[in-house]
Amino acid sequence: ETPDANNHYNCPIVTSYAENIKNNMEELATEHINFMNPFLALDNEEALKSRLFEELEAQYHLTADEINHAVDKAYAELSQVRTDIQNKGEEVLAYLAETGRTGIVLCGRPYHIDPEINHGIPELINSYGIAVLTEDSISHLSKVERPLNVQDQWMYHSRLYAAANYAKANKQLEVIQLNSFGCGLDAVTTDTVKDILTKSGRIYTVLKIDEVNNLGAARIRIRSLISAVRVRKKHKIEPKPVSPAIKRVEFTKEMRKNYTLLVPQMSPIHFEF
């Protein structure tokens, strides 16, 4: 999805959900449910077809042709869904440009789409007459200048950085990031997205939404952002895009005489490199 990113891993917690369900839900045994949780590589279409045939052929007597056809249809639909989301994002951007109104890129992980988790924040923003866009509706419109100050190796993160990079140069867009403290990797994204935006003189807002049913605090933060945006427009403060790329200093042999390396204690795998 992002060829120039360092890698394209998926969330390790999400990939372990099936194991968690298998080991903790007694109903699977008592109700005699056939619970299948094979590990599948979704980034390799041919490998996925092969693995699904291995898993499904014996139990459901499906042929390789049937599985191949189903996988082809699934990937076509996935591509179409992504295209639909991107087209809608471009449509909203065109509307904002035509009307001069403001839009907010509400960045969140896939599970933040669930109303039980986001607590109606998208609807709250809409109630102020502001358009809401997701990060994957605009991330295709920008490429982040690299290297960043983090290892950009998670697909969602790459999408998030690209969306922030696009928003920093568009004066009609603001960014609000939904953050769940249960996700350790989000601690990396909040700092990096903030860095991308604030370097260009933009406002960064993060809403920590874990276990909070009262929208009062979120409402105050959103109103504060809207007020700040109005003040900036009144004073004609324009964004000044700055590249988030950093220039790494290479440690040379000559530096060994006068420099000291501070190396934090890490696990053995970190020291392989």
Which positions does each model-derived feature cover?
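An N-terminal assembly and electron-transfer interface module characteristic of large anaerobic redox
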Residues: 1-273
